[in-house]
Amino acid sequence: MDTAAPLPRVLVIGLDPYRVPGPWDPTPVAEGIAAGLARFADAGVGVETCLFGLDGSDDVEAVVTEALDRRRWEVVVVGGGVRSPDQLDLFERIINLLRRHAPDAAIAFNSTPADTFDAAARWLAPPG
């Protein structure tokens, strides 16, 4: 029996909930991300994450570019924190990086961290 993890087909780009400034509890979002990623494993679909902080510790464009260039992605999911109105500039930069570095990838948007698999599945080609 082959127990190797499937090759990643999906990249999830989003905010690291533990590195978003402000007085808020990141635990529910982190738990939602973990639950959403578990659904990929349950479906046998490989996934990688590209989570970055807004605390100034990341060169966001470099981090995202490195992740996009790592392999050919079938789907890239852009998380909701990146799409919030106060992050419009960041959202535009990420979409343009996607256009340049993963032009063949479908772009998907989740509505919550827990439904990230559903967002990707809308665009995944059937296996085989």
Please describe what each predicted stretch is.
Residues T49-D58, N110-T112:
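Short beta->alpha junction loops
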Residues D55-V64, D118:
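Structural motif
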Residues P17-V20, D55-S57, V82-P85:
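Short acidic, S/G/P-rich loop/turn micro-motifs used as interaction or catalytic elements
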Residues A35-G46:
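Short helix-loop-beta junction
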Residues A62-L97:
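Mid-chain, well-packed structural core segment of small domains
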Residues M1-G22:
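N-terminal, charge-rich interaction modules
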Residues L90-G128:
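Ser/Thr/Gly-rich flexible loops in soluble cytosolic domains mediating phosphotransfer, phosphorylation
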Residues V20-G32:
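Glycine- and acidic-residue-enriched helix-capping/strand-helix junction motifs
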